[in-house]
Amino acid sequence: MTPDELRIAGFLDPRRALSFFEELPGGAEAWERDLSASADPDQALLAAIRLHEADPGLVRALVDKPDARRRVCAVLGGSQWLGDYVIADPTRAVAIWEDPGRSEQVLLASVGATRTEGGAYVAAEGARADDLRAAYRRVLLSVAADDLTSEDPGALMPEVGRRIADLVDATLEAGLALARRDIDPRGETPFAIIAMGKTGAR
């Protein structure tokens, strides 16, 4: 590809992009289309380079996985924070293209939550807030990838809102399970949470 072609594709610094593509397995032929389709092609390309430095095998494998590659590029170009999060531990990348399952099941399982006789969830002894945090972000990566690769984001928005609301609800439930384990292991203390549903709660 030429710098002019990359500029037309959306890269603000096409000469730098051209040199970066030479560092990626498969080069521009494998990556340009998916990166240029992201919200910020330059950011996505730089993040792809960093991901390759962190885990060359992962990026090399994406050359032969077009669907996964498209989703990874969309996330890298759509959110610098999520990109940094994946680059810090490339094993997290699999959440971008694999369905993690229902939010409630994933987050409660992350803290080993079980129900008391009264129906309240209580976390397992060894569970930590970090386990919950990792599960939350695993689901969030999947939601973000679906949203960022949708051909009709407007039509998908209600579903994304519902999934985010379910994720927040599951996070609260799992967080409460951690708290109950330490202060109310029998789940006998009655209380309520009142929250505003400004962003799609249901």
Write out the residue ranges for each language-model feature.
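Non-catalytic regulatory/linker segments of enzymes
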Residues: 1-202
